[in-house]
């Protein structure tokens, strides 16, 4: 598969370089008996910033999962970004999941909004409305509205979003990154049919969240 991003996300390169230099210096001056813990830390940092290619389903009405993680909510809720009632599906990412975000559908971005906020545990419901977050609202060619919200967590303190209003997105396209544990909420039209359940492990792009 042609994936236009390195398998280790660019967002992690500075962290990996720092961890590698520290491990090397401690190994050189103190030996492996002391440095092994720092080599383990380097391995953890490298695996955290991995960003592998994923197969993308071709089903026309499929809404793809925007992130790796575990489903923590499937419910009817108000979408405050598109001002409507919606089907809300939430994905919680722990520190061992891939943390890049990918577009759930093909469409054009009608809105991008950033909100400063708290850093509560991203697995709890109130993180959706109280934590730092960034929302993109996507309009599909069929006139359906899909909202994808990046939410910072207890450890995550940096949301990165690389798209702007008016730009097109294709399903599976990488559009953002959240560092060190977080959550993504997806709001869909009320009539959408969920294909996942609470507690299920999901993968970015390759898991179908719902059908429009």
From Swiss-Prot:
Main localization (coarse): membrane
A Pfam family: PS_Dcarbxylase
Cofactor(s) the record lists: pyruvate
Cofactor note: Binds 1 pyruvoyl group covalently per subunit.
GO cellular component, one term: plasma membrane
Membrane topology field: Peripheral membrane protein
E.C. number(s) listed in UniProt: 4.1.1.65
Active site residues of this protein: 182
Subunit (UniProt): Heterodimer of a large membrane-associated beta subunit and a small pyruvoyl-containing alpha subunit.
Family affiliation: Belongs to the phosphatidylserine decarboxylase family. PSD-A subfamily.
Protein's recorded name: Phosphatidylserine decarboxylase proenzyme
Gene field: psd
